[in-house]
Curated annotation (Swiss-Prot):
<comment type="function">
    <text>Catalyzes the four-electron reduction of biliverdin IX-alpha (2-electron reduction at both the A and D rings); the reaction proceeds via an isolatable 2-electron intermediate, 181,182-dihydrobiliverdin.</text>
</comment>
<protein>
    <recommendedName>
        <fullName>Phycocyanobilin:ferredoxin oxidoreductase</fullName>
        <ecNumber>1.3.7.5</ecNumber>
    </recommendedName>
</protein>
<dbReference type="InterPro" id="IPR009249">
    <property type="entry name" value="Ferredoxin-dep_bilin_Rdtase"/>
</dbReference>
<comment type="similarity">
    <text>Belongs to the HY2 family.</text>
</comment>
<dbReference type="InterPro" id="IPR022870">
    <property type="entry name" value="Ferredoxin_bilin_OxRdtase"/>
</dbReference>
<keyword id="KW-0560">Oxidoreductase</keyword>
<dbReference type="GO" id="GO:0010024">
    <property type="term" value="P:phytochromobilin biosynthetic process"/>
</dbReference>
<dbReference type="GO" id="GO:0050897">
    <property type="term" value="F:cobalt ion binding"/>
</dbReference>
<dbReference type="Pfam" id="PF05996">
    <property type="entry name" value="Fe_bilin_red"/>
</dbReference>
<dbReference type="GO" id="GO:0050620">
    <property type="term" value="F:phycocyanobilin:ferredoxin oxidoreductase activity"/>
</dbReference>
Amino acid sequence: MQPKPLAPPPGQHPLVQALAASIRSAWAGLPGLEILPCDEDLRFIQGQLDGEGLSIGNELFRCIGLRKLHLEVARLGNGLQILHSVWFPDPHYDLPIFGADIVAGPAGISAAIVDLSPTSDALPEQLIQRLEARPWPAFRQVRELPAWGSAIFSNKVCFIRPDGADEEAAFQQLVSHYLQVMATSVIEATPEQSTALTTVRRYEGQLNYCLQQKRNDKTRRVLEKAFDSAWADRYIDMLLFDNPPEL
């Protein structure tokens, strides 16, 4: 199935628009791609935060090898824009977690991150070689990871504040490269048994990834302020970082 591309809303930041297009293009060629069922009230959300309109749109798919592909684009008034995407693997497959986030405001991009995060001890060697096949851009403002992020991201994570349009373009190209490596790995992957020790370890690794991501208090505080604590918990636990199904 080929998902229908969405038209970008007026005033969307060029990097948000470019990354969303790259992500949609990358998942369009994955095997067995289909829409992932989701409560309709979580697909598109509208609220108020500090007197400004808050809108959140979610696109959710699954395919062979990946239990969930998620793209979230959020906007607060005419200022803050957020893109968040995570591809969660089926633990039966030896695949990493793809993740990318950007935060854009009137002054530009304040944060941009992309990673292929291992769910076992380390990334597969072949995957590392593919990532390293593209030279790493010389970004001028590399940011420090929060403690919870250091516990789950790989040593190939890129977390920066892009300095100008040239670095925004370089980051977009880097994300496209990570997406290509991820998509190739998904197509090539074969499943292992539920009882295999490697499968169990990947399952536990993904549980830990979700646990650490839920420690990002900034996300929870924004959602609680715009809606309420119960809704924020539901959104985070059921949509953003839901645990993988039991083996």
